[in-house]
Amino acid sequence: MRVKIIVPSLGESITEATIAKWYKKQGDSVKTDELLLEIETEKVTLEVNAPCNGTIGKISKTEGANVAVGEEIGEINEGASANTAGTNNESAKAQAVTQPTSEKPAVANNTLAPSVQKLVTENKLDPNNIKGTGRDGRITKGDVLATINTTTTSAPAISKSNEERVQRVRMSRLRKTIAQRLKDSQNTAAILTTFNEIDMSKVIALRNQYKEEFEKKHAVKLGFMSFFVKATIEALKLIPSVNAEIDGDDLVYKNYYDIGVAVGTEQGLVVPVVRDADKMGFAEVEKTIGILAKQAREGKLSMADLSGGTFSISNGGVYGSLLSTPIINPPQSGILGLHKTEERAVVIDGKIEIRPMMYIALSYDHRIIDGKEGVSFLVKIKQLIENPEKLLLNL
């Protein structure tokens, strides 16, 4: 019986994808749930597994092809591998007697995921020398990065005098989507950015005082992001328009707080969402952000992790950014930009003191948020971070 291989549901509002990599070819035997191919959507890369045992009877859509949800991309002849197993057994045994066994199976380039193959090629690595830790011994991106880290210190410098000076690389669907959405945001929203600065002295002191006890009790490190998430929620409650969006001729005010946290990955920027962050404690916020960030870097985020979000936070400070104007993530109406904390001279009670200061920025849609509201939003965050006890006491 022939069983169709179809493009699965890709999540909310996603109707099209690109075939990134086939791991099987026509005639190959497959088992139920064995990896067949990877499909790249505008947000994540998804695996498509075999629905039954059999052999690949047809591949109708090749790598690089755009496909729609529910579209047939191939078929499996169910049970075909089982019918031929008996006849193949004897020849397999004969080959086992006459052919020497390799200590380490070769890894063909066509078994590597596109992102992994790219790393291997760019760093001139032999995949046969990389131990795979993924499913069925597959080489993961982490395996390649670990190999790079262990070899870079001893590897001789490579002259690039004879290499091509220009490399043309096809944009991934994720990169195309990032480019399109950011440009759409600029073309649609009336984006305005307002700035403020925060004295980080008290929140740094509070973190230093309790970070070891916090980690021991909650099994997660106490960072600054949880303070900013909680402060942001209080500011959103004070200024509801920042948590709203425009839908046609209507303004939609949201009475829940799903906070998107921007994460930079090798494939591009993604914004996983911390759901109902207002109902979480500091430890749960830190754990959730840590899990989502790890999944983002490993390419394991689901569509649900990336969908929705009422407001976003982007922390360019981790890369050393001192000041920036973040771009709104549509259909949201605002995004908070955090930056590098550095010691600066400030006037405190008429005296010059050295304090750890951070610039913060709010980019917002001026169609729905007035200037007064934007400034008040940042002032509220400033007040809470400079007096973190108010966050803890819900003041």
Swiss-Prot record:
Domain Peripheral subunit-binding (PSBD): 111-148
Catalytic activity: N(6)-[(R)-dihydrolipoyl]-L-lysyl-[protein] + succinyl-CoA = N(6)-[(R)-S(8)-succinyldihydrolipoyl]-L-lysyl-[protein] + CoA
Pfam family, one: 2-oxoacid_dh
Keyword annotations: Acyltransferase, Lipoyl, Transferase, Tricarboxylic acid cycle
Pathway given in the UniProt record: Amino-acid degradation; L-lysine degradation via saccharopine pathway; glutaryl-CoA from L-lysine: step 6/6
Family matches, as PROSITE patterns: BIOTINYL_LIPOYL, LIPOYL, PSBD
Chain segments annotated as transmembrane: none
Entry GO MF terms: dihydrolipoyllysine-residue succinyltransferase activity
Swiss-Prot/TrEMBL cofactor(s): (R)-lipoate
Active site (catalytic residues): 366, 370
Residues recorded as bearing N6-lipoyllysine in the entry: 43
Subunit details: Forms a 24-polypeptide structural core with octahedral symmetry. Part of the 2-oxoglutarate dehydrogenase (OGDH) complex composed of E1 (2-oxoglutarate dehydrogenase), E2 (dihydrolipoamide succinyltransferase) and E3 (dihydrolipoamide dehydrogenase); the complex contains multiple copies of the three enzymatic components (E1, E2 and E3).
Function summary: E2 component of the 2-oxoglutarate dehydrogenase (OGDH) complex which catalyzes the second step in the conversion of 2-oxoglutarate to succinyl-CoA and CO(2).
Protein name: Dihydrolipoyllysine-residue succinyltransferase component of 2-oxoglutarate dehydrogenase complex
Organism of derivation: Rickettsia conorii (strain ATCC VR-613 / Malish 7)
